[in-house]
Each structure stands twice: as C-alpha cells, then as structure tokens.
Amino acid sequence: MSPDPIHRKGRKTLAKVYDSLSDPEEAADRSRIIGLPTKKEAHDIRNELTAAAWAGGKSVSRIRTAKEYISIAESFFRKLRAIKNAEQRTPQTGIPTLRELLRDTRVTNLDECERMIETARADTAILLVGRKDLRGRGARILLTLNETRLKMGKTTILLAHGTEKDYKAVLPAYKPKFYRR
C-alpha cells in the first residue's frame, strides 16, 4: 500500500518537484513527496516541459499522461540535484537555485531520450515558440535559456511555431518588459 502524499500549499510545478528532490530526507520517497498531480497541475507541468522542449527544437507531444510528465521532471531534477550536491558552497554563494542550475552548461537535457530538451549550445540556435509557451513558468524557462545564450555571446533566433498570425503575437512578447509585469 502506497503512503499518502504529502499535501503542499499551491500547485505542483517543476520548481516544487525540484525543491522536494533537493531535500535529502525526502528524496528517498519521491512518490510520497510528489503525489498524484491534479489535471490542472499535470497540464501546467506539460506546458513547462513543452516550452522547454520547443527551446531545444524538440517536441514532447507524444507524452500524454501526467505520470510520464512527472517521470521526465524527476529525471531532469535528479540530474540538477547531482550537480547541485557536487557544488562547493560558501556563505557568499549559498545553495544554487533552480534558475542558476538551468544556466549550468552541464545540464544538457531533461533525459537521455532523444525527444527531450537539450540546452542549445550551437553558435546559432533557433527557438520554436508556440502560443502556449508565453504563459507562466514555461515562458520563464524559455527566457532563462535565451538569457544564458545571450551571456555566452551566442545568437538566438525566436521563431513562432504555428500559423502566420501567431508570428506577430509571439515575437514582441519576448521584450524584457513582458517579464516584469
């Protein structure tokens, strides 16, 4: 019989999965930490992963169930946690945050599966962006990947994915003002 999930305030998101996996005392029993996501939570997590996958020029559309999304998220954050635990900590730097780890060049993909996100290392990356990617944390993941490349002095081209009318709606939204609201 499986243990009851720990109830946390607010929706489950990739960041909350990460926080749970980062706690050594809780990491042993991920099923207890994460529990089953609601339909809304599964949809949000899917949007986050889809946005990140588009950034890598890949698709996660074949993944249909919430369980599969959670599994991918776990794999991704296990990789992040391994890097996080290997980092030297000082009082000045503290523990690396999720945002910092997403920028780490050692974080190359969500999973070894071919269809998962890869952090674009090419000199020029084309990020395919759909309307769903402009909402919530999915958009912030895209922004983080974009910022990382800008700091490395690499060219990033944002392309709308979908119909012609999406093109004008998507590209202006990536101005910095959009993210400060």
Spans of model-derived segments:
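A short, basic N-terminal segment
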Residues: M1-I33, T38, E48-K58
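Acidic/glycine-enriched edge-of-secondary-structure segments
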Residues: S2-K9, I95-R106
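Residue-level preference for the first positions of well-ordered beta-strands
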Residues: R30-I33, S59-S61, T124-A125, T155-I157
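Glycine-rich phosphate-binding P-loop
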Residues: I33-T50, A66-A82
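Short loop/turn segments at strand-loop or loop-helix junctions that form parts
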Residues: G35-L36, T97-E100, L127-R131
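Hydrophobic, aromatic-lined core segments that form the binding pocket/scaffold
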Residues: Q88-P91, P96
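Conserved active-site beta-strand-loop modules that form the wall/rim of enzyme catalytic pockets
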Residues: T93, M116, T124-I126
